[in-house]
């Protein structure tokens, strides 16, 4: 297939083999952009002829690192597919991708995939609705917007086609790792929300329709009072969107990601505003 894949890594020995082997049947070349991993990530990558490793210092966020990859990877294929190391295409979607790509018209410059979420080994089916993300695009036709986190793909022209291709986000690390990661995320999220509270953010028209809708929802969330908004958001996800049907793992996911994490973000915002008085 006329596809190159790009994966960003740092100490991903627990995930990288699964991700690479998932892509071997659909990608001519797999570029791994590694931030000087200290585990076995690089050694695992070297086992595969289709994989080309480029090491580059972490610039501070995913968007900058991926855009650097777009500028520096010797991509010769028509299409680029992006996956994180802890992600993979669902088995039934591998064949679908081959068929969809073969039938695309010239005006289609990007494809959105459906996110399948796993938490502590269980698929989370409720609470957020269908999440679509642009994960494949014609070479030279897209870049990530410059954001600290929650970055979305900007497609410069043409059509973004919604597909039924599914990709899984299935991280194998333990809950302690997840909590530590989100404590770090909270600092960046607080900076983004503080910025949104002081100005109206109009979603970029180069974003997909789904990304624009998500950005509008975040703009609304940013205007709800601190601490109340995380509580309301959890209730919305867990009760109204039936997150309670996802069992114990589902409760932990919706509570930790929907309420706890966002409360930590609000605490950081509150502390910052308090110091400004």
Each model region followed by its residue ranges:
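Conserved donor nucleotide-binding strand/loop of the catalytic core
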Residues: 42-72, 76
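Short, well-formed alpha-helical segments that are part of the catalytic scaffolds
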Residues: 6-26
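Short, structured coil segments at secondary-structure junctions
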Residues: 26, 47-49, 132, 156
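Short aromatic/hydrophobic "clamp" motif used to bind/position activated sugar donors
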Residues: 78-80
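A conserved acidic beta->alpha catalytic loop
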Residues: 22, 34-43, 58, 84
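Catalytic-site signature of metal-activated, phosphate-bearing donor transferases
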Residues: 63-70, 83, 90-273
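Cell-envelope/extracellular polymer assembly enzymes that use nucleotide-activated donors
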Residues: 2-4
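Acidic helix N-cap motif at the loop->helix transition within catalytic regions
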Residues: 17, 39-47, 92
């Amino acid at each position: 297939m006329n596809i190159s894949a790009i994966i960003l890594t740092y100490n991903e020995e627990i995930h990288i083999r699964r991700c690479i082997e998932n892509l071997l049947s659909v990608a001519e070349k797999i570029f791994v952009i590694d931030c000087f991993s200290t585990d076995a990530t690089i050694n695992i990558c070297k086992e595969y002829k289709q994989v080309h490793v480029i090491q580059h210092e972490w610039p501070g966020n995913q968007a900058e690192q991926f855009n650097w990859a777009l500028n520096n990877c010797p991509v010769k294929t028509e299409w680029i597919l992006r996956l994180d190391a802890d992600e993979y295409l669902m088995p039934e979607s591998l064949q679908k991708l081959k068929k969809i790509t073969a039938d695309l018209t010239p005006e289609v410059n990007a494809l959105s995939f459906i996110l399948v979420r796993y938490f502590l080994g269980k698929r989370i089916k409720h609470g957020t609705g269908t999440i679509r993300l642009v994960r494949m695009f014609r070479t030279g036709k897209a870049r990530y917007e410059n954001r600290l986190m929650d970055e979305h793909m900007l497609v410069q022209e043409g059509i973004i086609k919604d597909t039924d291709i599914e990709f899984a986000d299935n991280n194998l690390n333990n809950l302690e790792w997840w909590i530590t990661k989100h404590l770090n995320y909270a600092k960046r999220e607080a900076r983004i929300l503080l910025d949104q509270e002081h100005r109206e953010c109009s979603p970029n028209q180069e974003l997909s329709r789904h990304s624009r809708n998500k950005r509008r929802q975040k703009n609304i969330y940013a205007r709800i009072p601190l601490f109340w908004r995380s509580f309301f958001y959890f209730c919305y996800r867990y009760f109204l969107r039936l997150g309670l049907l996802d069992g114990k793992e589902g409760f932990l996911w919706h509570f930790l990601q929907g309420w706890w994490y966002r409360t930590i973000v609000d605490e950081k915002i509150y502390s910052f505003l308090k110091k400004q008085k």
